[in-house]
């Protein structure tokens, strides 16, 4: 396996946009809380490390991963955030419940990203066993919460830049298409 015993959550602060003025929401599932607390801690610590003041990070808890969708929707509607991170953990069991929850949560978060103008970052572990989740929530593979926080900063920055250089302010090409000037954004390649 290419990721075996490799921490995938390291980041270079110099490649991340300034985040001190952004406001983030984090919606955390209480189910499998040993894992979701580790993911939350990774996300929170990464946001703080990237100069987001603690008072600009809002945390809401929901009972399970399926409820992340509603929690994120309400946070988007009421909290004036620049991005939301949803944190959950679904571990394979003996029934199809795992498939239904994973599919529903994935589609629900995708729908929020399509329907709203605020990025929602998916940090829901869908592992085969508890050890895989431990390894990805602060264990040998790093912390997916950390990775989600960095993604949230980058997406909040993209949203900010897109509103500054709105495409309707750009000239039309002779073909009638909008000419959009690209704003360089440093994003690490994985």
Swiss-Prot record:
Binding site for (2S)-2-hydroxy-3-oxobutyl phosphate: 94-95, 136
Keywords: Riboflavin biosynthesis, Transferase
Enzyme class (EC, first level): transferase
GO annotation, cellular component aspect: cytosol; riboflavin synthase complex
EC identifiers of the protein: 2.5.1.78
Protein residues bound to 5-amino-6-(D-ribitylamino)uracil: 31, 65-67, 89-91, 122
Pathway membership, UniProt: Cofactor biosynthesis; riboflavin biosynthesis; riboflavin from 2-hydroxy-3-oxobutyl phosphate and 5-amino-6-(D-ribitylamino)uracil: step 1/2
Biological process, per Gene Ontology: riboflavin biosynthetic process
A Pfam family that the UniProt record links to this protein: DMRL_synthase
Residues at the catalytic site: 97 (proton donor)
Reactions catalysed, as given in the entry: (2S)-2-hydroxy-3-oxobutyl phosphate + 5-amino-6-(D-ribitylamino)uracil = 6,7-dimethyl-8-(1-D-ribityl)lumazine + phosphate + 2 H2O + H(+)
A Gene Ontology molecular function term of the record: 6,7-dimethyl-8-ribityllumazine synthase activity
Family listed: Belongs to the DMRL synthase family.
Protein purpose: Catalyzes the formation of 6,7-dimethyl-8-ribityllumazine by condensation of 5-amino-6-(D-ribitylamino)uracil with 3,4-dihydroxy-2-butanone 4-phosphate. This is the penultimate step in the biosynthesis of riboflavin.
Protein name: 6,7-dimethyl-8-ribityllumazine synthase
The species this protein was found in: Flavobacterium johnsoniae (strain ATCC 17061 / DSM 2064 / JCM 8514 / BCRC 14874 / CCUG 350202 / NBRC 14942 / NCIMB 11054 / UW101)
């Amino acid at each position: 396996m290419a990721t075996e015993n490799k921490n995938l959550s390291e980041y270079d602060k110099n490649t991340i946009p300034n985040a001190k003025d952004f406001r983030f929401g984090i919606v955390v599932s209480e189910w499998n809380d040993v894992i979701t607390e580790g993911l939350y801690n990774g996300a929170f610590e990464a946001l703080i490390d990237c100069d987001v003041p603690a008072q600009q990070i809002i945390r809401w808890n929901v009972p399970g991963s399926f409820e992340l969708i509603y929690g994120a929707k309400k946070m988007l509607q009421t909290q004036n955030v620049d991005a939301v991170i949803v944190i959950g953990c679904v571990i394979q069991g003996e029934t199809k419940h795992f498939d239904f929850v994973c599919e529903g949560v994935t589609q629900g978060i995708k729908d929020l990203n399509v329907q709203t103008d605020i990025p929602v970052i998916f940090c829901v572990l869908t592992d085969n066993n508890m050890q895989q989740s431990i390894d990805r929530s602060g264990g040998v593979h790093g912390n997916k919460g950390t990775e989600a926080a960095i993604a949230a900063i980058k997406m909040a920055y993209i949203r900010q830049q897109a509103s500054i250089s709105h495409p309707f302010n750009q000239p039309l090409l002779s073909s009638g298409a909008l000419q959009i000037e690209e704003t360089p954004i440093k994003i690490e390649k994985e």
